[in-house]
Amino acid sequence: MPPKPIITKQDIINAAIQLVRENGISSVNARNLAKTLNCSTKPLFRIYTNMDEIKEDIKIELDNYYNSFMESKINDENRLLSQGLAYIEFAQNEKMIFNTLFMNMTMKGSSLQDIIHAKWNRITIENAKKVTGLSIEKSEMLFINFWLYSHGVATQIISNGIDIPLDMVQQLLENAFERFSLDITKTE
């Protein structure tokens, strides 16, 4: 009798991410994972206690993937602008993963203050202060305005299937950054 193929934790996560990428997080269940891995559901539950545990690992893996993507795209010349552009590019390239990370209530319970004070965003806000010469409070306001604008563009792309070329996205974001900066400067 040939040995049974061994399914690893990473095999399960890779299969789950493939399912998310193709059909969204709602497609990740034991039956679909087993089908993708070409096995029964037993190997899944030898490694994991339940589907919630699998989904926790999926979230971690997707967060790592997103963070790596963002880090490869962001530059300190204008971190806020490059972050917004990278965010939208990620939405264009990875619609279902973006939807899973940012549209399926993963931000539920977060306040704008939580977002402003997240370590990743503090770096961007400090850079915006340096780039614009605004106070830290005004840089936080610029960050929120720009972040919400970028999120709006990204959600239009994934929700309504609007095809916006990346060069046009860049122009939209540059205009928004300039406009938001000017408006905030007027209130100082």
Question: Across the structure, where does each feature detected by a protein language model lie?
Answer:
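Short hydrophobic/aromatic patch on the recognition helix
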Residues: 37-48
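Amphipathic alpha-helical linker/stalk segments
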Residues: 56-83, 120-131
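Amphipathic alpha-helical segments that line or abut small-molecule/effector binding pockets
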Residues: 77-96, 140, 144
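Short secondary-structure transition hinges
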Residues: 89, 93-126, 159, 163-167
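Amphipathic C-terminal alpha-helical segment
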Residues: 100, 147-165, 179-188
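Amphipathic alpha-helical packing segments from all-alpha helical-bundle domains
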Residues: 108-133, 140-144, 171-185
